Amino acid sequence: MDNLNLNKHTSGQFNAELEYIRTQVMSMGGLVEQQLTDAITAMHNQDADLARRVVEGDAKVNMMEIAIDEACVKIIAKRQPTASDLRLVMAIIKTISELERIGDVADKICRTALEKFSQQHQPLLVSLESLGQHTVQMLHDVLDAFARMDLNEAIRIYREDKKVDQEYEGIVRQLMTYMMEDSRTIPSVLTALFCARSIERIGDRCQNICEFIFYYVKGQDFRHIGGDDLEQLLTDHRRVDEA
């Protein structure tokens, strides 16, 4: 990943502190991405040992969030950052919260897989694995965009969530068909629906991280705009950057 071109300050220590928290976010992101990848694999392959490792690894994700958050608070208190520096710190605080929640999803998927699924549910898990891989790629891409604060890439990833939503809706229809055809599948299908919804939410969290990139680069809060208005804003910003 390319290094973000941070502002240069008269205090070399301030530069080092900003670079440290940015690097820590990328380390946390890498861990969460691996946790999610392993969770999807454990669910699909019914790998109990891998699932347990993911559950155990969630504590490290939580500790990293706390450590980065504390480092950000110290920077705000000590350096009183302004403008883009403050936006960077705020974007990091919000991003690590989203990453921690994605880590929680990985944990829940593994706990569910350990308790609820067996080999007889394999047909239900195939579509979940595909959706999971889609969100893993989305997470990987948004972490790369965050490392470079790449606005255009963030816009592309933001729009990618529509495909995740469509894939999720297809899975819901498929699972509902299973239930209607055989009522004995209802408990396992409901569990699969829970997993599918949890995985779909990862796309939403990646969208949130995209919004933090928009905020850092443009100094504008894009939350709660939504719909056609947001699409128009994103298109306008892209045209300005490409001009």
From Swiss-Prot:
Q: Which UniProt keywords apply?
A: Cytoplasm, Phosphate transport, Transport
Quote the subcellular location field of this record: Cytoplasm
Transferase found in the keyword field: no
Q: What is its main location?
A: cytoplasm
Induction of the gene = Decreased expression in high concentrations of phosphate and iron. Transcriptionally regulated by PhoB.
Work out whether the entry's keyword set contains Transport: yes
Q: What happens when the gene is disrupted?
A: Entirely abolishes the secretion of proteins from both type III and type VI secretion systems, T3SS and T6SS, respectively. Transcription of phoB is reduced by about 25% compared with wild-type. Transcription of esrC is completely abolished. Transcription of fur is increased.
Subunit structure comment from the entry: Homodimer. Interacts with phosphate regulon transcriptional regulatory protein PhoB and ferric uptake regulation protein Fur.
Indicate the family of this protein: Belongs to the PhoU family.
Q: What is the name attached to this protein's record?
A: Phosphate-specific transport system accessory protein PhoU
